[in-house]
Amino acid sequence: MVATTDERECLVRAMYFESNRSSFDGSMAVGTVVMNRVESERFPSTICGVVGQHKQFAPGVLKRKMDPKQMKPALHAADAVLKGGRHPKVGPAMHFHAASYKNPYPAKYVTVAGGNAFYLRPGKRWAQEYLLGPAAD
């Protein structure tokens, strides 16, 4: 994907604030979810649109200060994701939460990375999305 400087910054911010800041693996997992959402008709079609969507990512994700000393994993992961790299265990998952959170709703968990648990929501396309990727509507 060819991304603008602003789109790259939005992706870096999502990775920085949502994953363990020292974890390339966690950053890749968050970046994979962001890109899965960008590619889905159910979410905004831009990285900044996805990351800035109300109550979907950390509060203030697009405005809070980042510590330059802790940005390296997110910067490297963002560049990898923008070149087509994806976390191999996240697959088509479009959702995650802190691994310590006890989700009261059914979910198909696919991996834990960077302090987050990544999952698919149940539904008629659950198995298809996990095995084949998101279905075309």
What are the language-model segments listed below?
Residues 1-137:
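Bacterial extracytoplasmic/cell-wall-associated proteins, especially those involved in peptidoglycan
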